[in-house]
A protein has these predicted regions:
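N-terminal Rossmann/SDR dinucleotide-binding element
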Residues: 1-84, 94
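NAD(P)-cofactor binding segment of oxidoreductase domains
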Residues: 92-113
Length: 113
């Protein structure tokens, strides 16, 4: 499974489309904040990838990525990962940027360790 963060954002969506083209047999696990689940499902439908992707409601700022009991099973299935979830607005408060961009990245790396 190719694990992605950052979908349905601009970069994450384009990377997923590219990976789907270059890895036609791959499946995707998409870590998505619950508030973006519907948008993500629409993107998957638009790209004709709904049958190849599993939407994983979660949050990179949580130690277990919000995956709870599914954490280990998901980690065991990952063959490739691309972490694109981030806050790009430099005017945000420092603590928010740190929590998402630094701590969130650490949590994704922990999943892959």
């Amino acid at each position: 499974m190719i694990f992605l963060t950052g979908v349905p954002g601009f970069l994450g969506t384009r990377l997923m489309r590219s990976l789907a083209d270059t890895h036609p047999d791959a499946s995707f696990g998409l870590l998505v904040q619950p508030k973006f689940e519907d948008t993500t499902r629409q993107v998957l439908d638009d790209l004709d990838l709904a049958d190849r992707a599993e939407v994983l409601p979660g949050d990179i700022t949580e130690p277990d990525l919000g995956l709870g009991d599914r954490y280990d099973a998901i980690a065991d299935r990952i063959t490739m990962a691309c972490h694109l979830a981030a806050v790009y607005d430099l005017s945000i408060p420092r603590d928010v940027g740190w929590r998402v961009n630094v701590t969130g990245t650490r949590h994704v790396l922990d999943l892959l360790d």
